[in-house]
Every structure is written in C-alpha cells, then in structure tokens.
C-alpha cells in the first residue's frame, strides 16, 4: 500500500534506501572560471549520477523514468506564460518545446519538425529534459551508425520503437541536444541566479534556463523546497517515489519561479498543489507537495517495457554489434622514425640479406665507440691544444645504397607503400626502424589474410539520401531553367532575322574546305552557326531535332497500312525511359512518397475532356453536319506566313538592343515562356513538306478546332512536388504527353471522323493563340 510522505522528515526512508544515502549530503557549491571567462559552479556534493551503460545496451523505461517524463509533458494545465512574447495560458510542454525551437543551435528542418509534429517534439523534449537536469551526459548517441571514440550507442525503445524509420531523425545525439539547450539559455542575456530570476518581471525566463539554474544551485533548492533527506535530483532519479507526485513537485517548482509573485498567497494557491511549511523557508509555505512512497514492486510496475520495445532494443543491439564488427577502427599514424646513426648503419651493412633483425645492439653511442675501437672505423684527430679527439668514419654515399634497391645476393621483394594504397601494412603501427631505407630491404610481403581487408565506407542514412536527392534535383531544375531562358532569347533573336539572309550569312562564313564529316565540324554547313563566332548553346540543333521528331511521329501515325514496318510502341518506350531515369538516381532505400508528374496531371485532364465528349456524343441523336470545304476555300493567304505579331516585335527589340548574354543567376528563376525548348509546332513550309498543307487534305472531312491546351511549364516534377505552372518542360516530356494524346486520338477519332466527339483532334496541339481567336487555323 502506497504511503503519502508526511510534512516532516520521512522516517521510512531509512528502510527503503541504501545506508550510504541516508546522510544529508554536503551542500557546498564551489566556482571555477571557464575558458570564455564566465564563472561556472562546481557542484561538490549531492551531484546527480549520469546514465552509464555498456555500448549497445538499450535505455529502458525505468532508466529514463519514462512515466515521470510522460506525466510532465502531458499535463495540460494552462498556467504558464511563454517567453519572450508573453503569450499566456500555455502548458509546460508548449513553453519548453518553444524554447528549444527558438535556440540558435536548432536547424531549420528540426525547428519545422518541432512546430509541426507535436508527438515527435514531445519525444525529443523528454530526452532534452534529462540532459537539462544532467542525468544524461554528452557521451550518448541514439543511432547505431554513429561512431566516435568517446561516444556510446544506446537505443531508447520507448521513444524510438513506434516512430517512422524513414522520417527525419527525431532524437539527436546528446552533445547536439546539450548544444541546443545551451543556445536556448545563452542566445539572449538570461538571469543566471535564483535571485536574479526573482527580480525579473513575468515572463522571467524560459524553462530551459530555469532548470539549468535550479540544477546549478541544487543544494540551495533542496534546502528551501524539499524535506530532508529528499533533494532536487530525486525528481528524475528516485524510482521509489511515485511518478505522479514527482511530476507534480517538478511543475510546482516551475510555476513558482516562472509565474508566482513569491508571496504566501501564491504558494498556497499554486495550481499544482499548496506549498508546505518547514525549516529554512523564512516562514513561507514553499516546500513542494508531499511525495508518495512506493515499494520496489510498485516502482517496477510504473515503468514496464512492452514486448515490441524489448524486441526493438534487442534488434538494435545486434545491429550495433554487426556495425562495429564490420568497420575497423581508424588507424593511427606511425611515429616518424629517427635518423639512423652511422654505427647502426655499419652494423646492418655487415648483415647478410634475409637475416632476422634483432633489437639494437648498442644502447648508446659510447657502446658503439667501444665496439669500433677494434676496427678501422675509428678516426683520431689532434686538437690545437694537443688533446686527441676521436670520431667514427663517415660512410660514402654509395655505402648507404639509397639509390640501389638491393645488395649482393638474393633478397626478398621490396614492398612499396604509398598514401594512395590504403594497405593494412600502412594502417598498422610500424615497428621500430621501419622507416629506414636499409631496414625496408628486409620487409617481406604481408600475409595473405591481411591483403583483402580494408575499411568499408559507412552507409548513408535516410536523411543524407534525401538531402543528396534534393540537391541533385535542385541542380537539374536550375540548369534547366537557365537553359530554357537562354533558348527563349536565342529563338527570339533567330526569328527576327530573315531566313534567306540568315542562311546566306551562315554559308558565307563557312571556312574554305569545310567538311561536315570532319570530327572538328560543328554540323551541316549553313544550318548551324559557327560556335567560335556565334554561340547558341545548341538551340538551333534542338529546333531541327524537334522538327524531325514531330515529323517522324506524324509519319508513323499516318502509316495506316504499316508500310514502314510495325508501329512503334511508344507507351512501352516511355515506360523504359522512365525506368532508366529512376535507375540513374542510384539511391539505396525507398523513395519517400510519390510525387505526381506533370504528364500524369495533363493526362487526367485529357481523360476528363474525353469523357465529356463521349457523353455529348451519346446524348446527341444525329451527328452534326460538317461543312465541306474545298482546296479553293483554303486560300494561300491563310497558309502563308503571317506578319510578325506584337510578341515577335517585342522579342525583336529585345534581341536587337541587348543581344544574347549568358543568363545570370537572377535569370535562373525567371518564368519560362511557352515557346521554350521542346516546342515542336511547325510553320507552313514544314507542313507543306510533310503534306499537312497540301491540296490532298480535301479528301479528309474538315475538323473543327478545339482550343489548344496552354503551354504547360513542367520539368520533371519529382523536384519538390511543385505545381505544373512552377516547373519546366523538357522536349522528352512534351513528346510523351503529345504521343499519348495522339495515340488516344487514333483510337477515338480516326475511325469516326465525322462524329461530334471526334472533331478537331488532329492538330489541337499545333494551333495557338491569335489564330484561335479568329477561328482560323494559322501556323507560326
């Protein structure tokens, strides 16, 4: 049966706590000067114990006191004021998460996560509160892929087992969490003592800074607000006190220092319970509400891990073990060898090749002199004062054999090591003297079982994969927009020039002996400009390519008798291109979410239009009579080239005044017009060459003209899921959309040319703007 602790000293505490914790701890607070000049406290007594476990062992609910944290952050009492804007009626979770989000050390992605996902924010705040108290030090990380020499990995199943594995990581490592909390308390000048906090007006400070101050002055806080032998750190460590009573006491302290006026009435009217009177309070009832004492069995029942959490913890432990076994530790660089003395060189020179090298024969230079006294290597000199000076004979350059790679007799093959070759030999500590050139003669090849070992690269995390994918798509998007802007200016400049004058100028500028089959040629003479004189970035070639593609699609579609062979399966080709595009990304892991493309949205609109047309055709009792037209009715005037409209005139002045310049960075984000790369509308000359404007069209019943679809600006919409109006279109995507539309028109319109639903489907994508306003087909 749980007992409620009395207002006085708890006598039952001596029976339930170890003997060494029955004494009242020393409450001395020292100070030390930090490197930055600030004064920090050194808590010399009653210091909190950090969570410490072996690497890979999970932190279970009892270790982090999950029930206490849950009750603190799930309390919905709206009695707090948010710092610094002063918004009232906030609960504790709101003001604590807001303080974390306002920290200068919080990234933009994490800040958005804290503000949008309340449950993920609470999970992170639970760990931050333990770091805030000092229960977790900065040697913990919570992701098995992380490796550091002074870090240990521990999963937290109660917080991580039920989260999305592909989501942005919700728990940062402990050093990063500590940095976020320090930023929340140090970005702005905050009161750093209890007296300074009391002198401030509401809102006095944020809860992160308040908890740091309370932990720093824990002995004073324990003396003022707790009955002995309880102290401030019992709130997060003492499992034999009920989680509910500890959470109430913690929130009582938060409200007292953040919201109260420190009067007797405020202590009695605390929303988390009236304060209690006791010693050291100055006559005020400022002791926290009494605690509920639990037995060991009752304490264990408060924090029970579920089966799924236990399985998750074991899974992560094994994963961590596998990662540590697969990755070798970072090798230490060998010490730089000392210069070989002469006496050691002479000793090694006398050895036969292949002889095992023992340790140094001479421990010092004096031993070498004594050994050389019996040989001819000792040279004596007479000083001017008559004394005799002895020294060893200096060897000749050829004696060192630095240039020669071998001595007389067979010797093992020398193993050369370079920095580029990340061999295990270079990674392992070198034996003494291994850097000497002569010692290297005796280095044999490494054993076979060491040759294949090399450090494996770490796999990228889901967040790193998403960032890399986003970066690639962003680069492609910007390059496509700049390319489209350049093509727009170049096309406007090309259209303002008379074709005969343009091609005549290009032909005159051809060098003598120009051959289009030469490797250095820039293309067919007279069609493409000389890149040394006029750079068009491939706009002209892209234009002719679009004409050829459109012509080939027209001929393939009009080949009803399959005279040119079997018809191409364009749908299959599009699927293969899409599959190749996805494989080119070369990413491991699943793509987070599916983003609809511009072609799929356009296809949905076309399907809706076709359904409406079918419904209209079914409702119509008699087919609409089509007005016959003859070749005479289609006058040459209508098929001739129209005068330049206002848009071309504007483009003319733009091209004439400014000329073509490489688009700047600011131009990269300008809107792209409909006549960019990939527009394949044919002029009347090309249509006459293809048979679309000749008199043989009179045999085909005329078709009404449908309003053309507006030019859709769409690049590959896998970039951030933008709208169709915010993206660019490539030539391949417009080809896919047009092929799909025209292939479907073959099925619905070619066999029923006079049907009301089949009118005007042939060249709907080739008719544009001013011609549609007049009700007459015209071609730019």
From Swiss-Prot:
UniProt biased composition (Low complexity): 614-635
Record's keyword terms, sorted: Nucleus, Transcription, Transcription regulation
Major localization class: nucleus
CC per GO annotation: Ino80 complex
Segments of skewed composition (Basic residues): 600-613
Keyword Nucleus: yes
Biased composition (Basic and acidic residues): 563-584
Start and end residues of each stretch annotated as Disordered: 1-25, 563-780
Superkingdom of source: Eukaryota
Entry's transmembrane regions: none
Feature: compositional bias, Acidic residues: 676-686, 723-751
Compartments where found: Nucleus
The protein's assembly and partners: Component of the chromatin-remodeling INO80 complex.
Cited PANTHER family: INO EIGHTY SUBUNIT 1 (PTHR37287:SF1)
Functional summary from the UniProt entry: Probably involved in transcription regulation via its interaction with the INO80 complex, a chromatin-remodeling complex.
Identification of the protein by name: Ino eighty subunit 1
């Amino acid at each position: 049966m749980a007992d409620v602790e009395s207002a006085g000293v708890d006598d039952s505490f001596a029976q339930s706590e170890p003997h060494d914790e029955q004494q009242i701890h020393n409450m001395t607070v020292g100070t030390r000067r930090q490197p930055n000049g600030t004064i920090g406290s050194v808590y010399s007594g009653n210091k909190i114990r950090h969570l410490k476990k072996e690497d890979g062992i999970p932190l279970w609910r009892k270790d982090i006191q999950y029930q206490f944290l849950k009750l603190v952050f799930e309390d919905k009492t709206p009695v707090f004021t948010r710092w610094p804007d002063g918004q009232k009626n906030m609960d504790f979770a709101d003001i604590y998460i807001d303080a974390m989000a306002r920290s200068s050390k919080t990234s933009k992605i994490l800040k958005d996560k804290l503000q949008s996902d309340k449950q993920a924010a609470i999970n992170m705040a639970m760990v931050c509160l333990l770091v805030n108290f000092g229960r977790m030090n900065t040697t913990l990380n919570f992701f098995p892929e992380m490796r550091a020499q002074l870090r240990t990995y521990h999963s937290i199943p109660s917080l991580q087992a039920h989260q999305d594995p592909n989501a942005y990581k919700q728990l940062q490592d402990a050093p990063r969490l500590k940095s976020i909390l320090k930023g929340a308390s140090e970005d702005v000048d905050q009161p750093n003592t209890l007296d300074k906090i009391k002198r401030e007006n509401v809102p006095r400070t944020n809860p992160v800074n308040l908890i740091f101050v309370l932990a720093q002055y824990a002995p004073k806080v324990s003396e003022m607000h707790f009955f002995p032998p309880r102290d401030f750190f019992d709130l997060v460590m003492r499992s034999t006190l009920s989680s509910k009573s500890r959470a109430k006491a913690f929130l009582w302290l938060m409200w007292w220092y953040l919201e109260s006026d420190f009067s007797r009435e405020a202590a009695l009217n605390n929303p988390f319970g009236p304060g209690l009177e006791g010693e050291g309070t100055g006559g005020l009832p400022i002791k926290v509400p009494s605690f509920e004492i639990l037995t060991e069995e009752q304490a264990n029942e408060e924090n029970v891990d579920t089966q799924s959490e236990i399985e998750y913890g074991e899974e992560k432990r094994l994963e961590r073990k596998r990662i540590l076994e697969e990755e070798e530790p970072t090798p230490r660089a060998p010490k730089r060898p000392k210069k070989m003395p002469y006496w050691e060189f002479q000793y090694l020179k006398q050895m036969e090749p292949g002889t095992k090298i023992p340790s140094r024969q001479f421990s010092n230079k004096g031993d070498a002199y004594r050994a050389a006294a019996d040989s001819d290597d000792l040279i004596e000199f007479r000083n001017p004062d008559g004394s005799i000076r002895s020294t060893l004979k200096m060897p000749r350059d050829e004696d060192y054999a630095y240039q020669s790679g071998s001595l007389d007799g067979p010797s093992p093959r020398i193993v050369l090591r370079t920095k580029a070759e990340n061999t295990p030999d270079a990674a392992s500590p070198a034996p003494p003297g291994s850097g000497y050139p002569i010692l290297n003669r005796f280095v044999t090849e490494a054993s076979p079982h060491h040759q294949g070992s090399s450090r494996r690269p770490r796999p990228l995390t889901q967040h790193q994969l998403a960032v890399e994918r986003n970066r690639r798509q962003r680069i492609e998007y910007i390059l496509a927009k700049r390319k489209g802007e350049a093509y727009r200016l170049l096309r406007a400049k090309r259209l303002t020039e008379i074709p005969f004058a343009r091609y005549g100028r290009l032909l005159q500028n051809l060098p003598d002996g120009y051959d289009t089959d030469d490797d250095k040629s820039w293309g067919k003479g007279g069609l493409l400009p000389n890149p040394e004189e006029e750079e068009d970035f491939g706009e002209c070639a892209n234009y002719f390519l679009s004409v050829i593609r459109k012509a080939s699609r027209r001929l393939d579609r009009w080949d009803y008798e399959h005279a040119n062979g079997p018809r191409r399966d364009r749908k299959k080709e599009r699927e293969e291109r899409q599959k190749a595009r996805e494989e080119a990304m070369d990413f491991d892991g699943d793509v987070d979410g599916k983003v609809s493309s511009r072609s799929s949205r356009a296809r949905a609109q076309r399907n809706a239009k076709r359904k409406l047309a079918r419904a209209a055709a079914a409702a119509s009792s008699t087919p609409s009579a089509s007005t016959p037209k003859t070749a005479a009715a289609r006058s040459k005037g209508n098929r001739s080239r129209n005068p330049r409209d206002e848009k071309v005139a504007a483009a003319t002045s733009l091209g004439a005044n400014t000329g073509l310049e490489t688009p700047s960075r600011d131009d990269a984000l300008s809107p792209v017009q409909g006549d960019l790369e990939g527009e394949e509308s044919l002029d009347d000359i090309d249509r006459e060459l293809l048979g679309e404007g000749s008199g043989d069209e009179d045999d085909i019943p005329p078709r009404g003209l449908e309003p053309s679809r507006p030019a859709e600006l769409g690049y590959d919409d896998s970039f951030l899921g933008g709208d169709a109006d915010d993206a660019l279109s490539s030539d391949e995507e417009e080809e896919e959309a047009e092929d799909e539309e025209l292939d479907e028109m073959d099925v619905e319109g070619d066999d029923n040319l006079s049907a009301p639903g089949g009118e005007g489907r042939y060249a709907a994508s080739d008719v544009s703007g001013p011609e549609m306003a007049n009700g007459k087909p015209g071609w730019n």
